[in-house]
Swiss-Prot record:
Entry GO terms, CC: host cell plasma membrane; membrane; viral envelope; virion membrane
The entry's keywords: Fusion of virus membrane with host endosomal membrane, Fusion of virus membrane with host membrane, Glycoprotein, Host cell membrane, Host membrane, Lipoprotein, Membrane, Palmitate, Phosphoprotein, Transmembrane, Viral envelope protein, Viral penetration into host cytoplasm, Virion, Virus entry into host cell
Main location: virion
Source taxon at top rank: Viruses
Gene Ontology annotations of biological process type: fusion of virus membrane with host endosome membrane; symbiont entry into host cell; symbiont-mediated perturbation of host process
Matches recorded under InterPro entries: Baculovirus_Gp64
Function comment: Envelope phosphoglycoprotein which mediates the fusion of viral and host endosomal membranes leading to virus entry into the host cell.
Membrane-related topology note: Single-pass membrane protein
Protein name: Major envelope glycoprotein
Family: Belongs to the baculoviridae gp64 family.
Localization per record: Virion membrane; Host cell membrane
């Protein structure tokens, strides 16, 4: 029998020179589209597998199943290509012993990938190269740092050095690099951290007699203690703000993600009867919605309330009239002492 159908698909890796040319022309190069080649011409499908000669802005595969020449070999050949420029996640890391730093390019899962301006990375059917080498800058800044002990009455207690830098709190207790994605910070050894002034303790004899007039030194000591407590309070407030901002960003991303599935979510959050349709990742269109009468039916016009949302409905047999509903309270017997 010679009537079988064979379908194959092959991914071609694009070299550095070709990628650079694609970037300049903003087009990608493919081979000739072959349609219904039969007989000896069907051998054309096995030639020219380099994908040359046709420049396009983008192209998708076209699957064909035509066979108009019975008992003859026939073939179809199609190409797919595309070109785009996108930003990649990056992470800065520094070595503690040499103080040398390097920028790593990350994939969507946060794993480092080997893509540079000189090396093409072929991954998941995509060939990619960096258009520009990643760089970083260094600077020296003065930061407000406090020496904090978990238990100031215990000399063995853990001591931490917290520093406020650009509205973020960094723990610089160890003389090592503290890296957070695109930023690495290290405290200079010779720099000093503000310590808590020595305070009176219940197990230490008082330095003055109760009832005596406070000296200038006593007042200066109290002033230093208050200044330290004020700095500590401001640092804790900044730390709280950082956590709140992080939660706000997470909530924003969550709402945007869910709103692409639930078109009424944004309207409900705005307390408006509108439906949202996303035009891009961060742009959406709002359209007014009608408000059905409450507590009458699960259907209204050509819509039905199903799985927590109003959706289109053409089957009237699913509509239920519950205008004579009865409210049910489940906590009537609950007593609070």
């Amino acid at each position: 029998s010679n009537t079988r159908v064979e379908e194959t698909m092959k991914t071609l890796n694009v070299g550095k020179e070709d990628l650079l040319m694609w970037s300049i022309r903003q087009q990608c190069e493919v081979g000739e589209e072959l349609i219904d080649r039969w007989g000896s011409d069907s051998d054309d499908c096995f030639r020219d597998n380099e994908g040359r000669g046709q420049w396009v802005k983008g192209k998708e595969l076209v699957k064909r199943q035509n066979n108009n020449h019975f008992a003859h070999h026939t073939c179809n050949k199609s190409w797919r290509c595309g070109i785009s420029t996108s930003k990649m996640y990056s992470k800065l890391e520094c070595q503690d012993d040499t103080d040398e730093c390097q920028v790593y390019i990350l994939d969507a899962e946060g794993n480092p990938i080997n893509v540079t301006v000189d090396t093409v990375l072929h991954r998941d059917g995509v060939s990619m190269i960096l258009k520009q080498k990643s760089t970083f800058t260094t600077r020296q800044i003065k930061a407000a740092c406090l020496l904090i002990k978990d238990d100031k009455n215990n000399p063995e207690s853990v001591t931490r050095e917290h520093c406020l830098i650009d509205n973020d709190i960094y723990d610089l207790s160890k003389n090592t690099w503290n890296c957070k994605f695109n930023r690495c910070i290290k405290r200079k050894v010779e720099h000093r951290v503000k310590k808590r002034p020595p305070t009176w303790r219940h197990n230490v004899r008082a330095k003055y007699t109760e009832g005596d007039t406070a000296t200038k030194g006593d007042l200066m000591h109290i002033q230093e203690e208050l200044m330290y407590e004020n700095d500590l309070l401001k640092m804790n407030i900044e730390l709280m703000h950082a956590h709140i901002n992080k939660l706000n960003n997470m909530l924003h991303d969550l709402i945007v993600s869910v709103a692409k599935v639930d078109e009424r979510l944004i309207g409900n959050l705005m307390n408006n009867s509108v439906s949202s349709t996303f035009l891009s990742d961060d742009t959406f269109l709002l359209m007014p919605c009608t408000n059905p009468p409450a507590h009458t039916s699960n259907c209204y016009n050509n819509s039905i309330y199903k799985e927590g949302r109003w959706v289109a409905n053409t089957d009237s047999s699913q509509c239920i009239d519950f205008s004579n509903y009865k409210e049910l309270a489940i906590d009537d017997d609950v007593e609070i002492l």
